[in-house]
Design a protein with these regions (language model features):
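Well-ordered beta-sheet/strand-loop patches within structured domains
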Residues: 2-283
Length: 283
């Protein structure tokens, strides 16, 4: 179902709100915010024309136990991927749609793996989104063109071996739409479960996944895994078969500062609204 948007005229709204508050004498207010209705880029009538008819595949991950900032960043990143359309033959780039990741773009500091350390940085947790998209693409029988596993196995991406790390500008996660119609990506969070669903037109292909299998597991937490994606056409002929190997190092090689990543002063590039939201999540 199509939904029309509403764009607020921020300058007019600021002046209107300030004027109404000034004249209210502390009484309750009902303010009609100025703005304009915006048509959806893709309407319901366009869906059949583009081939958005049925479910192709589903990917899920579980982020139970995530710190508040991590959950916040996951939800913020998801805003970039609602109803993304991937054209036939197009290569989807996660980093391209994600855009900038910093305080100015609404992200909070949380732990990331970078420079051989586990340290707080804006956007920690976004890989929950990229890993879920990876799984949806795999189960939809699409061609993965770029993917890298995390430096060490992270509990939020079980089963191990089906994660996809990203960092702007690289590493990126990419897949190619190998169908003859558009693919639409939709996501939802239910409790601690993040789900991506890919919609398009089924062409008779079937996808089978073998694994992931743990090939080797060290006492230091290091691990090697592999899984295989096999895709057959409507006649049962295999036309795509890829193995995805993951080599995880020991977590001890990446110093961890602990769970306390709280800021005590407002970063200079943050708005007051961002700082209030941060303090609300981190009392």
């Amino acid at each position: 179902r199509e939904v029309y948007g509403f764009v607020i005229d921020q300058e007019k709204a600021k002046k209107l709100i300030a004027d109404e508050i000034r004249m209210s004498n502390h009484s309750p207010l009902v303010i009609n915010i100025p703005g304009q209705s915006v048509e959806p880029k893709i309407k319901a009538s366009d869906m059949d024309k583009l081939g958005i008819k049925e479910l192709l595949g589903v990917g899920t991950t579980n982020f139970k136990g995530s710190p508040k900032n991590r959950v916040y960043n996951i939800k913020r990143a998801l805003e970039q991927f609602q109803s993304v359309m991937v054209a036939p033959g197009e290569e989807f780039s996660f980093v391209h749609y994600l855009g900038e990741v910093d305080g100015e773009h609404g992200y909070l500091p949380e732990l990331v793996i970078r420079n051989n350390k586990t340290e707080p940085e804006f956007g920690g947790g976004i890989c929950q989104v990229s890993s879920t998209v990876f799984r949806a693409a795999i189960y939809s029988g699409l061609k993965i063109t770029e993917r890298r596993n995390h430096s060490y196995a992270v509990q939020y991406y079980k089963p191990y071996g089906m994660d996809a790390t990203i960092y702007v500008p690289r590493p990126d996660f990419k897949f190619k739409n190998t169908t003859d119609n558009y693919i639409m990506m939709q996501s939802v969070i239910e409790g601690d479960i993040l789900t991506f669903r890919f919609f398009g037109t089924k062409d008779g292909r079937t996808t089978s996944i073998d694994g992931p299998h743990i090939l080797e597991r060290g006492g230091d937490g290091s691990m090697r895994t592999v899984f295989t994606q096999e895709v057959k056409d409507k006649d049962g002929t295999v036309f795509q078969k890829d193995s995805f190997a993951s080599n995880y190092k020991s977590p001890s090689l990446f110093p961890h500062p602990g769970e306390d990543t709280k800021l005590t002063t407002k970063p200079s590039n943050w708005s007051n609204t961002q700082w209030r939201e941060y303090k609300r999540l981190n009392p």
